Amino acid sequence: RLNDLLKAITQHYIDRGYVTSRAYLPQQDLADGELDVIVVEGRLEGVEGSAIASDRELALASPAQTGEPLNLRELEQLVEQINRLPSRPAELELVPGSDVGGSRVQLKGEPGKPWRVGFNRHNDGQRSTGEQQWGASLEWDSPLGLADQLSLRAGGDAVSDRWRHSANQSFAYSLPYGWWSFSYAYSQSYYRMRTQGQGFPFVSDGESKTHQLRADRVLHRDSISKTGLSLGLAHLETRNYIENALLGSSSPRITETQLGFNHGRRLGSAFVNLDLGWQQGIGALDAKNSRIDGKSGTNARYDKYSLTASYLQPFQLLGENLSFDSLINYQRSEDELNSPQRISIGGLSSVRGFKDQSLSGNSGGYWRNQLRWTRPVDWAPLQPFVRQYGLAFAYDLGQIQGDRNNARSHGRLSGNALEFSARGPNLAVSLTFARSLERPDVIERQEHPIYARIDLFY
């Protein structure tokens, strides 16, 4: 019974991450009817990063403190912060320390190239602003030696003319600090398109700029789950023109606060993730007044609520590797939102099967489902270029609720798709054949889009 008691006490510590703590019975006289149990709380004597991380990077990324009881959850957080850099595949190893119950942590792994460049070409653009699109990216791990990350991206239409053009650029930077992660992102975009009015063509163009600050905090983690909270502040400025005349009613300046909750969990071999969000428009940073446009009634002091839930289940059938994934994205607002805050469905990233036609509204959502089969390439001459190929079948559906600004443009969309894909060390290609199924009357025609994409990366 005493052994069972000691095991229970030790297990209590282990379940909370104190894997080097142990309970034992010292020599004692039980004549007084009291039992003394001593717990040796294993201490952390230090963390060694070797080539995978410098001392400065470890100091920022690790919530664990030397001399404190060793907690595996803190060390898992450290490894996760380092592993978020693709060039730092770190693994954890505990080695005995110099003191009784003490342990040292060694991070094992070989660092890779700290930067990555990528180029892509696809046809997922809009016909009005350029269907054929290109993109380029640069990622740099730990540019300041702080386990930080820098990302630069740019893209645009591959064929421009007087009537059609689009371009976009973005910058992102993230910095870890123990249980926290801080990030800043900036993006800007420009479009030019042809519009028709009273039988005459006009040039319509516009630009948008977005700044976002965000802080993420891990609240709890154990061997199968992680829970976190995020706080953010975003500022968006949009300017739209017709023949160089500013359209004030559709050119808002919006500032919003963001509060998010995240919970991820492993269920057997499956993975489940839940994100809840609340966004509120405020008047800071020169945001416009509550009523931006008296005609449309769009509101810059809005409240918007969002939910995203995902499920991934890998499995094998008859010796083949398969996976099923499902994602639900939903938002709701009782306020009239400007276009950037509204939810849109119809396209490769929401309801496949639609490309030139879509629905948007204050409230709505979509549900994506996909069954994927993958197989490694066995033919040796092809392996330097392609390591894996696969096939996926998808079925998506979405719903937009009616509101003041879309009395007709609401309803339900659904579509399916068949995707062929291949991937190698420096190459990824995909070809997707999609078909629209359900659509409301406002969506005038059925679509059969074909999405093609090629990515080169180094």
PLM feature segments, named:
Residues 1-125, 155-167, 327-328:
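Periplasmic polypeptide-binding modules associated with outer-membrane biogenesis and secretion
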Residues 67, 122-124, 157-159, 196-203, ...:
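Extracellular loop and loop/strand-boundary signature of outer-membrane beta-barrel proteins
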Residues 94, 119-123, 150-156, 171, ...:
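Transmembrane beta-barrel strands of outer-membrane/channel proteins
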Residues 101, 130-134, 165-169, 207-211, ...:
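Residues that define the transmembrane beta-barrel architecture of outer-membrane proteins
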Residues 109, 140-142, 175, 217-219, ...:
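Residue-level signature of outer-membrane beta-barrel architecture
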Residues 115-117, 144-150, 178-184, 222-227, ...:
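Repeated loop/turn-to-beta-strand initiation elements of outer-membrane beta-barrel proteins
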Residues 138, 213, 309, 420-427, ...:
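Outer-membrane beta-barrel "beta-signal"
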Residues 239-397, 401, 444:
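C-terminal outer-membrane beta-barrel translocator/porin domains of Gram-negative envelope proteins
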